[in-house]
């Protein structure tokens, strides 16, 4: 089975968030199920610099008015197709934002071109290779099924995965005439959305099937609270909507072999975790006194509940705990956390930015990680935490609810609990969860039991890859 995956980012070449991790790990996990995946990605400077000896395999003479070369290359275990279009992707900023921190004004064209190239590959323009289906990810690739329906050929099926419905690729109606689509594509059954153009809405309408990254999130986006205005469109296609939870790369995230942490350990031998805890305290220059050490590793935004977290810092300290934070985002939230660190010198440490090695060390050394997201399609941070014996304290939403077993009376009695959930997502709810966590921490036998259960949880891609492979087979066998 040959599948074309289409994405705006892929780990380890270019990453701004969890999308890259998923797109980079899933093809490798699918190999065991007989699925060969080729991933189409934009030819950003960082991507072209990272690969070795790419080979030109096709030339697009007119991709929305620009020429582009298609390069094929193997990078580690990934089979890549790179869309080398300097007019679109040769930028000095990031994948989506310029150096000023604002969206590139032509993002609509940059990612429509990526989708159009994908649709043409799906139609068979590459000599000697044509996919059996196309798997597009998020709004940046959501025009792929649109072009497959309107501009190319709908002979093969398409799957659109929604990683976060908050990002929809919405642009003014004035761009429609430049998208190389027939006039009737601008309508309710196409890409029109309240007199604007919405790439994601178009993909939701035209893909053969839809998926999102956890069963709970698949249910949530059917509601007005979480559907971000698209719940009606998704509801009309609920019969083809699937929720498949993300996994993690269990080789990269393995405390027994991880070279980024201070000391290795396993569920069978947790002693060395204490050495990592000491290393975290030293890094953040906070007290090393054996008290419960909480952490936050996150984008510092309202969606992630960081405003609540900033208000809950005093509660952690009053309970005798400590807190370390790694992340960046909203300047006001960064400031609130930095102020808390100044207020609680020796008890709270904050590092603004993102640091992959430090995130590994924090998972390996902190006792618990707090994830108070208002919505969370899947979340990977809590999966890393489970793997590392760092107890997740999570809002009961989306993938967080699906992957963490709350330490309620029933779960504690049956020895199944792996973390702490709270709802509603309010300051009081978060404070209560923190108090519960501190109480469990002071019961060493229970705490160790929860750690070991989490570490033994199957958070790898193996099961989820099987579900994707089965869905692919189902779509291909049905035809389009």
Curated annotation (Swiss-Prot):
This is Glycogen synthase 1. ADP-alpha-D-glucose binds at residue 15. One of its GO terms (biological process) is glycogen biosynthetic process. Its EC number is 2.4.1.21. Belongs to the glycosyltransferase 1 family. Bacterial/plant glycogen synthase subfamily. One of its GO terms (cellular component) is cytosol. One of its GO terms (molecular function) is alpha-1,4-glucan glucosyltransferase (ADP-glucose donor) activity. Pathway: Glycan biosynthesis; glycogen biosynthesis. Synthesizes alpha-1,4-glucan chains using ADP-glucose. It catalyses: [(1->4)-alpha-D-glucosyl](n) + ADP-alpha-D-glucose = [(1->4)-alpha-D-glucosyl](n+1) + ADP + H(+). Keywords: Glycogen biosynthesis, Glycosyltransferase, Transferase. It comes from the Bacteria. It comes from Rhizobium radiobacter. HAMAP family: Glycogen_synth (MF_00484). InterPro entries: Glyco_trans_1, GS/SS, Starch_synth_cat_dom.
């Amino acid at each position: 089975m040959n599948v074309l995956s289409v994405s705006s980012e892929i780990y380890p070449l270019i990453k701004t968030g969890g999308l890259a991790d998923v797109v980079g790990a899933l093809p490798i996990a699918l190999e065991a199920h007989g699925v060969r995946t080729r991933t189409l990605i934009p030819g950003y400077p960082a991507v072209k610099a990272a690969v070795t000896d790419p080979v030109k395999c096709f030339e697009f003479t007119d991709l929305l008015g620009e020429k582009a070369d298609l390069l094929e290359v193997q990078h580690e275990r990934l089979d890549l197709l790179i869309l080398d279009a300097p007019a679109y992707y040769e930028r000095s900023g990031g994948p989506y934002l310029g150096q000023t921190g604002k969206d590139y004004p032509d993002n609509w064209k940059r990612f429509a071109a990526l989708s159009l190239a994908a649709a043409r590959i799906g139609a068979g323009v590459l000599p000697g290779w044509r996919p059996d289906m196309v798997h597009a990810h998020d709004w940046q690739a959501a025009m792929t099924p649109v072009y497959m329906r309107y501009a190319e050929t709908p002979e093969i099926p398409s799957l659109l995965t929604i990683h976060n419905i908050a990002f929809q690729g919405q642009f003014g109606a004035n761009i429609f005439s430049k998208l190389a689509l027939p006039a009737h594509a601008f309508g309710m059954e196409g890409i029109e959305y309240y007199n604007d153009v919405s790439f994601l809405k178009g993909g939701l309408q035209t893909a053969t099937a839809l998926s999102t990254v956890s069963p709970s999130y698949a249910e949530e986006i059917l509601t007005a609270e979480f559907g971000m205005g698209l719940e009606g469109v998704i509801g009309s296609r609920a019969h083809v909507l699937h929720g498949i939870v993300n996994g993690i790369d269990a080789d990269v995230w393995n405390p027994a072999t991880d070279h980024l942490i201070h000391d290795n350990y396993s569920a069978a031998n947790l002693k060395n975790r204490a050495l990592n805890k000491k290393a975290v305290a030293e890094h953040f220059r906070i007290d090393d006194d054996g008290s419960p050490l909480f952490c936050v590793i996150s984008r510092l935004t309202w969606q992630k509940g960081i405003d609540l977290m900033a208000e809950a810092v005093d509660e952690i300290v009053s309970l005798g705990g400590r807190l370390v934070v790694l992340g960046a985002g909203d300047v006001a939230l960064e400031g609130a956390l930095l102020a808390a660190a100044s207020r609680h010198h020796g008890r709270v440490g904050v590092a603004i930015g993102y640091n992959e090695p430090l995130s590994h060390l924090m998972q390996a050394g902190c006792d618990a990680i707090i994830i108070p997201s208002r919505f969370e399609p899947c979340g990977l941070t809590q999966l890393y935490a489970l793997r590392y014996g760092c107890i997740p304290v999570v809002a009961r939403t989306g993938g967080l609810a699906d992957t963490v077993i709350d330490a309620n009376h029933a779960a504690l009695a049956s020895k199944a609990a792996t973390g702490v959930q709270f709802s509603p997502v309010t300051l009081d709810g978060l404070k209560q969860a923190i108090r519960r966590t501190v109480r469990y921490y002071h019961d060493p036998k229970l705490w160790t039991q929860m750690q070991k259960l989490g570490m033994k949880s199957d958070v790898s891609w193996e099961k989820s890859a099987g579900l994707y492979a089965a869905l692919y087979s189902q779509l291909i066998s049905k035809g389009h």
